[in-house]
Amino acid sequence: MAIDENKQKALAAAMGQIEKQFGKGSIMRLGEDRSMDVETISTGSLSLDIALGAGGLPMGRIVEIYGPESSGKTTLTLQVIAAAQREGKTCAFIDAEHALDPVYARKLGVDIDNLLCSQPDTGEQALEICDALARSGAVDVIVVDSVAALTPKAEIEGEIGDSHMGLAARMMSQAMRKLAGNLKQSNTLLIFINQIRMKIGVMFGNPETTTGGNALKFYASVRLDIRRIGAVKEGDNVVGSETRVKVVKNKIAAPFKQAEFQILYGEGINFYGELVDLGVKEKLIEKAGAWYSYNGEKIGQGKANATTWLKENPATAKEIEKRVRELLLSNQNATPDFAVDDSEGVAETNEDF
């Protein structure tokens, strides 16, 4: 539809004035925006990357990962850091819980010598550090562990038993307004780990909620609900956890998908096991009886042996991964594998915990 010539001149003059006052790029036509194609970082899980629709977590955005205790929240974020470091990116870990284990992080592939770490005294200090790192433009991934541990200064300086209703929610709301723009400008990914609480007196529906008020729910581009759904056993020994992640919010692709994978103790996400399963599903890896083969070459009898073979042959594993991603990420409009029922999602509440 043609625009009146006088209107075009007026629009050009207005845009010129805005750019002169606020800088080049402060206003543009959406099709000219170079950042439309969202850059992503792998989560360390191939099935979760595919469930996210864009191939990983989006740069320049806020992501929330929540779930019960020992569900794999910190492990997942450490795998994201390891993946980012392999791409040469700089990462920071804001350890508000004062519980980061460097030995475990190293086992997951994190380069702890180049990982920035802070253990802030107050919630305000933690969020100011996040903002300073984002504004620097030199840090690519920031992880905050966790929102529940971001204690307002007034609460720390007060006495146990004092009422501080709404302080944490107000602190988070103010921080989100400040952080969102800075993260976009510096293309920094900020991941918040969050805990689950129970609302008192809920007779019907899901009593679960997350801490820190509602601001994070709104500002997050991606929200992941992670749960432990079973145990991985070798004989009688439990060697890991079966884990399910639901994408309950997604602003970069279709939401409401899910991924299931194994987290092995001391090793992290069983990436090569996922590769075998997805390779068979997409008919890239042939399975005849107990034998697995790729391009006519047998790679192992049983899934465990096939997984070991892929670990020992990273070039072939990379080739299979590339083909799986091309097949499954090319169809962005595919029907979600799983839709989160309203009764299952974590409820929102104005209560502050």
UniProtKB/Swiss-Prot annotation:
Domain of life from the UniProt record: Bacteria
Main location (coarse class): cytoplasm
GO biological process: DNA recombination; DNA repair; SOS response
GO cellular component: cytosol
Sites where the protein binds ATP: G67, P68, E69, S70, S71, G72, K73, T74
One Gene Ontology molecular-function label: ATP binding
Keywords of this entry: ATP-binding, Cytoplasm, DNA damage, DNA recombination, DNA repair, DNA-binding, Nucleotide-binding, SOS response
Function of the protein: Can catalyze the hydrolysis of ATP in the presence of single-stranded DNA, the ATP-dependent uptake of single-stranded DNA by duplex DNA, and the ATP-dependent hybridization of homologous single-stranded DNAs. It interacts with LexA causing its activation and leading to its autocatalytic cleavage.
Family: Belongs to the RecA family.
NCBIfam families attached to this UniProt entry: tigrfam_recA (TIGR02012)
Record protein name field: Protein RecA
